[in-house]
Each structure stands twice: as structure tokens, then as C-alpha cells.
UniProtKB/Swiss-Prot annotation:
Subunit structure as annotated in this protein's UniProt entry: Homodimer.
Keywords: Cytoplasm, Methyltransferase, Nucleotide biosynthesis, Transferase
Signal peptide (UniProt feature, chain positions): none
Annotated binding of dUMP, by residue: R22, R180, S181, C182, D183, N191, H221, I222, Y223
NCBIfam families the record matches: PRK01827.1-4, thym_sym
GO terms for MF: thymidylate synthase activity
UniProt organism field: Vibrio vulnificus (strain CMCP6)
Similarity comment text for this entry: Belongs to the thymidylate synthase family. Bacterial-type ThyA subfamily.
Cellular localisation: Cytoplasm
Protein name: Thymidylate synthase
One Gene Ontology term, aspect cellular component: cytosol
Name of the top EC class for this enzyme: transferase
Length: 283
């Protein structure tokens, strides 16, 4: 929680104003931020200076793991995070590759589970990583990559957190996640949860011990219409004790995650928080 608040304060105090062409808004921006999450000791990085809806973040991650490409499927899991980008993005609404209502195109999990090969067929990146780690293999390339410039025109949004690199030291699993862009007031509380949970769940299904998760953000920003709420409300609140995160121990394989797992298989204990803050969202 401390490192999250330090980043927010750094943006407010040291950020540069940048015009964002996609949203038509100005952003207060800093370059490069590094966050570390101690998964081994269950130090769950859930924001306490406002209420954080962690279940939606886990649901979104589960949708990526399953390779979903439709906002309706994400809603069924328990999150509406893709409704706007799938249905309110003018450029995507006029894109000939859009299949209809709720279609997201070839984004995130689609790339992770079905990366198109130039010579035909697809690569299931996640399956390969899970199989390797389960056998104790780390080829120094256990990388889940969502960033496919050749297919950007076939999806509603480029990936923000685009790379997850898993590494083994003995029987301890580590994760380095890289994010090109981060809406800090709205997106980062989701992204922190997802990086933490991804390492925790991958360690569990591959029979390894979780270590640390390292989260690099390249462009961290606060939109102009979010600044007052961050500076004058959230940053004036005292952080509270971190909660703990728990996963159903019966989840033992990638197939479990693909089939029967729901949000009921994850829970948080000891979450105390301040009141919610309604930050504006930019499509």
C-alpha cells in the first residue's frame, strides 16, 4: 500500500502534463514505476484508502486465462470492465473486424491462448508455460505476451499490461509483469491484484511455491478529471492494514481454471477500507 501511495504522490508532485490523443484529455504523467508484491508471505496489495472491488479484477484475469473475446463472457464471470471498450468505442464500432455487440476482438487472452502463426495455426502460450513449470522447466522464456502489433486492428484496445514472464529458482516461482500504460486511480488497483493473483494461482496449479511478483509500469498517469479526487481526497486518507488473499486448494490445474472455477473460489480476509471514490473513466 505504501508503494502505491508513493507513486500517486510522485505523479501529483512531479508529473508532466501530456495530451492523450485517444481520449482527448490531458494526463499528469511520470515515466517508469516499479512495484513489488510479496506473494510468499501473503501481503495482498489491495488498496485501502478507498474501497477496491477486487473480485472484478480476479474475474477479468480468469477471463484472460480462458481466452475470452466477448464482454458478455466477462460479465458472466463477474466483471463489466469490457463493456465500454467493446460497445462504446467509436473506432471499434466502425471496425469491419467487429463481430457484433460485446465483441472485443483479438485482445489479451485471445493472444495468450491462440496467437496466430504466420504459417497457419495458433500457439497456446499459457499452456506451454504451465506444462513447463509443472515439470520444473524454466527455459528463460516462460513469457505470456499479449502484445501483437500485427493484429491491433482486429481488437478494441491494445493491451496495457502486456507481458508476464515466469521464472523458477528451485521450487519457487517468480513473476515479472510489464505494463506500457496505467490509469493509476482506476486501473492500478486492478492491475496490482491481477499480478499478485496470477503468480499465486500459477504457483498453485504447477505445484510450486510463490515468491515475489515484480510489476513494471512504463507510463503511469492521472487524468486531469481525476486529479482533484486523488490529491484532495484519497491522498489525505491514512492507509489501513493489508488483508490476506486465499485460493480454493482444490484448484489444481489449468483445466480447473478453464471449467468450474468461479469467484466463490477466491476470498479475502481482514479487508478494511475507506469509502469508495468514483473516479471518471476514459474510453
Amino acid at each position: 500500500m505504501k508503494q502505491y501511495l508513493e507513486l500517486c504522490r510522485r505523479i501529483v508532485d512531479e508529473g508532466h502534463w501530456v495530451e492523450n490523443e485517444r481520449t482527448g484529455k490531458r494526463c499528469l504523467t511520470v515515466i517508469n514505476a516499479d512495484l513489488t508484491y510479496d506473494v510468499a508471505n501473503n501481503q495482498f496489495p489491495l488498496v485501502t484508502t478507498r474501497k477496491s472491488f477486487w473480485k472484478a479484477a480476479v474475474a477479468e484475469l480468469l477471463g484472460y486465462i480462458r481466452g475470452y473475446d466477448n464482454a458478455e463472457d466477462f460479465r458472466k464471470l463477474g466483471t463489466k470492465t469490457w463493456d465500454a471498450n467493446a460497445n462504446l468505442n467509436d473506432a471499434w464500432l466502425n471496425n469491419p473486424y467487429r463481430k457484433g455487440e460485446d465483441d472485443m476482438g483479438r485482445v489479451y487472452g485471445v493472444q495468450g491462448r491462440a496467437w496466430a502463426k504466420p504459417d497457419g495455426g495458433h500457439i497456446d502460450q499459457l499452456r506451454k508455460i504451465v506444462d513447463d513449470l509443472t515439470r520444473g522447466v524454466d527455459d528463460r522464456g516462460e513469457i505470456l505476451n499479449f502484445y501483437n502489433p500485427g493484429e491491433f486492428h482486429m481488437g478494441c484496445l491494445r493491451p496495457c499490461m502486456y507481458s508476464h514472464h515466469f521464472s523458477l529458482l528451485g521450487d519457487t516461482l517468480y513473476l515479472n509483469s510489464t505494463q506500457r500504460s496505467c490509469d493509476v486511480p482506476l486501473g492500478l488497483n486492478f492491475n496490482m491484484v491481477q499480478v499478485y493473483v496470477f503468480l499465486a494461482i500459477m504457483a498453485q496449479i504447477t505445484g510450486k511455491k510463490p515468491g515475489q511478483a515484480f510489476h513494471k509500469i512504463v507510463n503511469a498517469h492521472i487524468y486531469e478529471d481525476q486529479l482533484a479526487l486523488m490529491r484532495d481526497v484519497q491522498l489525505k486518507r491514512e492507509p489501513l492494514q493489508a488483508p490476506t488473499f486465499h485460493i480454493n486448494p482444490e484448484i489444481k490445474s489449468l483445466e480447473d481454471l478453464e471449467t468450474w472455477v468461479t469467484l466463490d473460489d477466491f476470498w479475502v480476509e481482514g479487508y478494511e477500507h475507506h469509502d469508495p471514490i468514483q473516479y471518471p473513466f476514459s474510453v
